[in-house]
Regions:
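Single conserved hydrophobic/aromatic residue that forms the stacking wall/gate
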Residues: 2-13, 187-197
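Catalytic binding pocket for nucleotide-activated donors in carbohydrate/polymer assembly enzymes
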Residues: 85-86, 93-189, 193
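Structural motif
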Residues: 29-30, 67-70, 89, 114, ...
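Long, K/E/R/D-enriched contiguous segments that form extended
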Residues: 1, 11-80
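Donor nucleotide-activated moiety binding/catalytic core segment of transferases
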Residues: 62-106
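Residue-level preference for alpha-helix termini and adjacent loops
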Residues: 2, 74-78, 82, 125, ...
């Protein structure tokens, strides 16, 4: 989830703000709250990527008062108590059928945040109870994920055919001003256990 968000955020930063610094842009703050288990290297790399992207955006004058990224270390209940009521959008974008979820998404919704989510975990029950008009669905269903795998999933095709995606992935692979390449994250799929919310 956080890796997907980082890719999307990279697009907002590069394509929208850097390519057109004078565009009308609604100021946005992206908050990431997570905790990496000690042995999960991929999760630690994703956290480093988020912090690297945050530092790059923070020092870019084009982003001042427009875009901010904050990573909340050691995400826990006391942070959630402050974060959840302040959130306007909750992105619950795990791969459908791949992750169990708790009730965090419900807490965001009950506090007024709009939910963008896949039909996975508790989002399924929320969608059944609240209907299409109260949740913004994203991505494939669990059945569609299985079908896509059976039909053959070739991510390189998407990379080669989508110039926006290619640009973001190339940037992540090259790294930012900290000169750290995140290419290893682009060619792996983290396990749901890698990031603990």
């Amino acid at each position: 989830r956080d890796l997907r968000m980082s890719r999307g955020l990279g697009d907002v930063y590069k394509r929208q703000l850097q390519d057109d610094p004078n565009m009308d842009f609604v100021p946005q703050t992206y908050l990431f709250g997570a905790k990496a288990a000690p042995g999960y290297h991929v999760a630690k790399e994703i956290i480093q990527l988020i912090n690297s992207l945050a530092a790059q955006i923070d020092k870019d004058p084009v982003c001042k008062d427009k875009l901010q990224v904050v990573f909340l270390e050691n995400y826990r209940v006391s942070l959630a108590e402050k974060l959840i009521p302040a959130s306007e959008i909750s992105e619950q974008i795990s791969t459908a059928g791949k992750e169990a979820s708790g009730t965090g998404n419900m807490k965001f919704m009950m506090n007024g945040a709009l939910t963008i989510g896949t039909l996975d975990g508790a989002n399924v029950e929320m969608h059944q109870q609240l209907g299409d008009e109260n949740i913004f669905l994203f991505g494939l269903t669990a059945q569609e994920v299985v079908q896509r795998k059976q039909q053959g999933y070739h991510p390189m095709d998407y990379y080669q055919q989508d110039p926006v995606l290619k640009r973001v992935i190339d940037q992540l692979s090259a790294g930012f001003d900290d000169h750290v390449s995140y290419a290893c994250l682009l060619y792996t799929s983290p396990s749901p256990r890698d990031m603990r919310r």
